[in-house]
Regions:
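Conserved catalytic core of sirtuin-type NAD+-dependent deacylases
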Residues: 2-132
């Protein structure tokens, strides 16, 4: 960088990592913490293929509750700002999120990777079908 504030002239590639904090501002509960989504559930009981085999109703209920809550929240200023950067940045940009919600997409982000999957999509191990 030759001058302060001249970053756009020297930086072409950006990778951004977001986590629970960005969606918590919209009212999405985090997985950890005193009121987190894991409270009252062991990860092994709701978030593994083995859990689904053992108790598919519990797993389905757990995720149905998360999906229902997601319908009641909206992207916040952080989601909007990242979507604007995605739209206007001429270079390469990748937004990597640890979140399973769709708030980045709803804000308009296109160059996005979900590290832990997406709450609104599923994959069948038996037939390799994808559901959204």
């Amino acid at each position: 960088m030759t001058k302060k504030g001249n970053m756009r002239n020297t930086i072409n590639n950006i990778v951004i990592l977001t986590g629970a904090g960005v969606s918590a501002e919209s009212g999405v509960a985090t997985f950890r913490g005193p009121d987190g989504l894991w409270e009252g559930h062991r990860v092994e009981d709701v978030a593994t293929p083995e859990a689904f085999v053992r108790d598919p109703d519990l797993v389905q209920k757990f995720y149905d509750e998360r999906r229902a809550k997601l319908k009641t929240v909206e992207p916040n200023a952080a989601h909007q700002a990242l979507a604007k950067l995605d739209k206007t940045w001429a270079g390469e940009l990748l937004l990597v999120t640890q979140n399973v919600d769709d708030l980045h997409e709803r804000a308009g982000s296109k160059r996005l990777l979900h590290m832990h999957g997406e709450l609104n999509s599923a994959w069948c191990r038996a037939c390799d079908a994808h559901f959204a």
